[in-house]
Each structure stands twice: as structure tokens, then as C-alpha cells.
Amino acid sequence: MPGNTFGHVFRVTTWGESHGPAVGCTVDGCPAGLPLDVADIQRELDRRRVGQSRVSSQRREADEVQILSGVFEGRTTGTPITMLVYNTDAKSHHYENIKDRYRPGHADYTWDAKYGFRDWRGGGRSSARETIGRVAAGAVARRLLATFGITLVGYTLQLADLRAEVFDEAEIERNIMRCPDARVAALMVERVDQARRELDSLGGIVEVRARGVPPGLGEPVFDKLQADIGKAMFSIPAIKGVEIGEGFGVAMLRGSQNNDPFIRRDDGTIGTVSNHHGGILGGISTGEEIVVRLAAKPPASIAQPQQTVDRDGNPVTIEVHGRHDPTVLPRLVPVAEAMLALVLADHLLRQRLARVTWEDRSDD
């Protein structure tokens, strides 16, 4: 089964299933000498962990990461970094009575259509639990980016029709919705509680920003920076739409409105007055803030009766019980940050291979 590896230079392979013994990843291509501690990875995994609030799945997992290779005495060795998280609270019996019934909105049918055989326990490889490996790898990428002054911040921008109206970065980790608007965050929690009582779920939008990205990252023509960002984000379970900068809003603008005038800043660097382009032009970073938005569908696992068919095509009714997220948004935030970090780390290393300057050459 191909498709488990992401990146060109900074390469990440994830592995494992939702109800298997463990999940994890291997990072290859990380330079040697990068300071890295298990706490760096655990911090990000804790943000993604299930059961952390009433707006997430009540599955109880510690998600304690183990670094098996690639790190010695607190620094990366330049060899593959393998990280592992054991699954300790899988309850496969919740799926016994529906294993031959196709859950609406899930990948059950499509995986059967492709492989003719699938792990039906909790969605197997198609489960969002696979994203543990992404978040662990993203934590390594973030440490690398930090050495170049690049930082990322993600947050819940919108839940259903409730949209943040204020951006207070300090507020993001203070509320369980990870929303930068405290007032709207409280309304979001109430809406999620209502959906849970009604045995339903809610979608929304997560936004991620990257700051300090130097100009010049991106590989024309088919590996444009926004193309790789789009692939990264669309590979996350539940994502149905991705925007960069003004996104679909550009359809309503004139060129005179959408163009961002260039200026020379006081420090001598080139920048733009506005940022409709979201930090990318021609597939290459401009040095402005990179702004990405992801539209997430409502989680497909709901306990309402739904019409479907079984593997033989017979009409049946299904109710999906178990421990499921009423919305993915708060736990999606660290996953989206991780995927953007992986793209930027990969392109940062690729850029260092793109050209040789006279300053890079040593005297003979």
C-alpha cells in the first residue's frame, strides 16, 4: 500500500491502525545536531490527545511517545527518527455489529472497493488516530523551523455559523475550542453540547498561520508551495476544503483590490502593504505571513439511525455507537499545524539545495 510517505528531503512515513498495538512514524532527512527532547513531541501530542475535554472523543489514551531511534544525548543524529505511541484503550467490540455495514460518510465502502479487505476496528488505517504520527513528526519539524525563526499558530476560526470576530492569540489555549475569541468560544461550546445531546456533529474551519518564513521557498512548477500545502491539508481526515490567503474570496475582487503593493521596509527588506496572497506568489513564499484555512466536515460517526447497505448490497439501518468527537476542530488544530510545519521544513531544506552562492564556496 503506497501513499504512506510525505515529503522529498524531510520525509515522514506514518504507520499503524486505530485499534492495532501502536501507531507512530519515522522521520528521515532531519539534519544532525538539532536539539530535540521527548518533551517537545509530547507537548504537541497532548494537544491532540483524545478525552481532553467534553467537546472531544471520550476514548482515554495517554498517548505517551517513545523515541526509538535517531536521537542521542538530546540531539538528532541525522539517521531516521522513529517514534511510537501504544494504543491502550481500544474497544473493538463497539464495531462488531456493524463491521459488514457501510457507515455513511466513512471510508468503509471505498477501502473495500480498493483492497477487498479492511481492518474494520475503529476505521483501521483510515482513522484519525493515524494523525498521531503526523503530529509527532510535525513536532520535530517545528524544532527545525524554530532555529530559523519560523513559528506557527493555529486556531478554530469557525464552528458551523459561529465565527471568531476577535483575534487574541493568548486566548487560543485558554478555552477548549482553541478559538481566539473568548465570547464566541463559549457559544461554540454550547453549540457542541447541543449537537451531542441531539446525537449529531458539527463541522467548521481551522486557520493556521506561519510567521518568519523567508522569501524563496517553493519549487515551480508542480511542487509549488501552495500545491504541497494543499496536498498536506487535504490528506488530513475530514478535510473537504483548503484556502490560502484570500482564497475563494478572490472571485469577488478586482485586480486593483487583490494586488498587494510591494514596499521597502525600514530594515531594507521587501514586503507588501496587504496580504491577500497569503504569503505565496508564483508558488514561492514572499516572506509575508502564510495563511491557510481548512474546512472540516462534521464527524461521520453519529448515533442517529441512518440508512445504508451491507457488503452484499442489502438495505440496512445503522447506528454508530462508541466514543466519537462531536466536532474535530480543537484536535484538528495541532494536526494542521504539524502538516504545515512538515511542508515548510521540507521546502526549507530543498531551498538550501537550490543554488550555490559565492559565499558558500570555499577557497581551493
From Swiss-Prot:
NADP(+) binds at R48, R54. Its cofactor is FMNH2. One of its GO terms (molecular function) is chorismate synthase activity. CDD domains: Chorismate_synthase (cd07304). It is an enzyme of class 4 (lyase). Reduced FMN (FMNH(2)). FMN binds at R125, S126, S127, G282, K297, P298, P299, A300, S301, R323. It catalyses: 5-O-(1-carboxyvinyl)-3-phosphoshikimate = chorismate + phosphate. Transmembrane segments: none annotated. Belongs to the chorismate synthase family. This is Chorismate synthase. It comes from Chloroflexus aurantiacus (strain ATCC 29366 / DSM 635 / J-10-fl).
